[in-house]
Amino acid sequence: MKSGRFIGVMSGTSLDGVDVVLAAIDETMVAQQASLTWPIPVHLKKGILDICQGQPLTLSQLGQLDTQLGRLFAQAVNALLARQRLQPRDIVAIGCHGQTVWHEPTGEAPHTLQIGDNNHIVAHTGITVVGDFRRRDIALGGQGAPLVPAFHHALLGHPTEKRMVLNIGGIANLSLLFPGQAVRGYDTGPGNMLMDAWIWRQCAQPYDKDAAWAKEGQVILPLLQKMLRDPYFAASAPKSTGREYFNYGWLERHLTAFPGADARDVQATLAELTAVSIAQQVLLNGGCERLMVCGGGSRNPLVMARLAALLPGIEVSTTDKAGISGDDMEALAFAWLAWRTLAGLPGNLPSVTGATEASVLGAIYPANPITQS
């Protein structure tokens, strides 16, 4: 089995930066050693948002974004290597998720698209890359997401304690880790995505730091109820979603019935939407003893407080308490998935995604042996 140092690269639906994690991985352990977050330039963020929200673009524009993101990911990796004084030969492989710009796992031709050309990452780092993790699962009839529950189970599963792991990124997803049962997991709906989109449009701020703006507002109950009637929330698992569904246009359509709504009240309502939609799914699955939260939303004190209030009797805490940085969880997961691919081990869980079988995931982009010698 391949073992040694791996790097995970993750750019999620929140678009709050490229997370890069260095970890030592083998069949018995995943030990995080270093991490950094690399900024996404404004022009790239705008290009990604335009695609995700269905704005027209040419194939040339898509190709340019693909190349530019690949180069950006390479810059982030090289920055981490320089900080740790490591050479390409010290790294077995990079596991790169890419940037999801469209995710449509149902219909006549299910598909998902992550951009950020892995060839450019190899060329500019000299390190083998494993990428394109989701499309094999979709080819096998699965949702292609979420893939992280397998990692949650490997790191945070417990033989007797009923646990759930909640990742609040742009989209929120839940992993059900119940002793003696197959792992399950799915996307519950919007995490930070709508909150971030609203404050960006209203205040030109990338996110609501410490939920300060939302705390100034009051929940608009009729708006909350209207949003919660969206069919996605009542749909059965397996299910997954993304920015192509829960985007600013979705929010605007719901706001048409509330002209003149105070912007702070809308922000408070979006925070409540995230908390309530998650709590409903936790309770629908019978609850748990511990809800372990990771992702950028775990730093939102209002969402965390509301989760605790909506889920009495359940310990709500961040994964940091278990020794795993909530900010780095997903990047770490894709480093681990790269290790599994190189080891010839399956990376998906059919009980989570609905695929017909477990499978080795991803495509391998080998480095030139000269650069890794």
From Swiss-Prot:
Pathway(s) of this molecule: Amino-sugar metabolism; 1,6-anhydro-N-acetylmuramate degradation; Cell wall biogenesis; peptidoglycan recycling
Listed Gene3D superfamilies: 3.30.420.40
EC primary class: transferase
UniProt keywords, alphabetically: ATP-binding, Carbohydrate metabolism, Kinase, Nucleotide-binding, Transferase
Record's keyword annotation contains Nucleotide-binding: yes
EC id: 2.7.1.170
Single GO biological process annotation from the record: amino sugar metabolic process
GO molecular function: ATP binding; kinase activity; phosphotransferase activity, alcohol group as acceptor
Function: Catalyzes the specific phosphorylation of 1,6-anhydro-N-acetylmuramic acid (anhMurNAc) with the simultaneous cleavage of the 1,6-anhydro ring, generating MurNAc-6-P. Is required for the utilization of anhMurNAc either imported from the medium or derived from its own cell wall murein, and thus plays a role in cell wall recycling.
Name recorded for this polypeptide: Anhydro-N-acetylmuramic acid kinase
Organism: Salmonella newport (strain SL254)
Gene of this entry: anmK
